[in-house]
Amino acid sequence: MDAYFDEEDKKRRAENVYRQYPVLRDKKVLLYAPTFRATAEENAQLLEKFDIAKICQTLGDDWYVLVKLHPKFPSENITLHEHCLNMTDYSDITDLYMVADCLVTDYSSTVVEYVLLDKPIILFAYDLDKYDRGFYRDYRSTVPGDIAYSTEELLQLLQKNVDNAQKRQDFAKLQYDYIEGGSLDRVFAILQKE
């Protein structure tokens, strides 16, 4: 987790992305990283509900949308827009976190790491009532961002330029005992005591 607090490492990771995708430099970036679903039909809905054309139109030319689906998702099925890049085959999602200005996800564990960067998060839970994999905590009351239950609600949240800082802070406190880095030093100190 220390990588999320090391400014040099964050810059290096962002530069990895910019070197490969220079069009992203000086643009705002929305990262869409949903969790994998059990059936092909449910997985197809991930991109039907996340209407890339409408989202790109709503965000405007200053934004790029990065789509990072689960590696099991057939990435050739992704229809893109001129302001959207398929990053499904990109090897390290942490690099993508560093260039993203906002994360859109659903039930994915990506929020547990991304929340450490203290950037806006939107939860796109269009199928919450049907999603049956269970949660450790009550989803609606503990997620680190605003929830959109439909494509229209997602578009509205994107237009509002959501912040949700308090929700992120509350979520981070639920997940972590320490939120300032230094994990390696703490582990080393414990090992030295033994």
Regions found by a protein language model. Name each.
Residues 1-2, 35-39, 71-74, 92-93, ...:
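Short, solvent-exposed loop/turn segments at secondary-structure junctions
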Residues 1-42, 166-170:
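A nucleotide-sugar donor-handling region in carbohydrate enzymes
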Residues 29, 64, 101-102:
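Structural motif
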Residues 32-33, 37, 53-88:
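Catalytic donor nucleotide-activated moiety binding site of glycosyltransferases and closely related
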Residues 44-52:
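Charged helix-capping and loop-helix junction motifs
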Residues 71-112:
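Donor nucleotide-activated moiety binding/catalytic core segment of transferases
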Residues 79-80, 109-176:
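Catalytic binding pocket for nucleotide-activated donors in carbohydrate/polymer assembly enzymes
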Residues 180-194:
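C-terminal alpha-helical cap of glycosyltransferases
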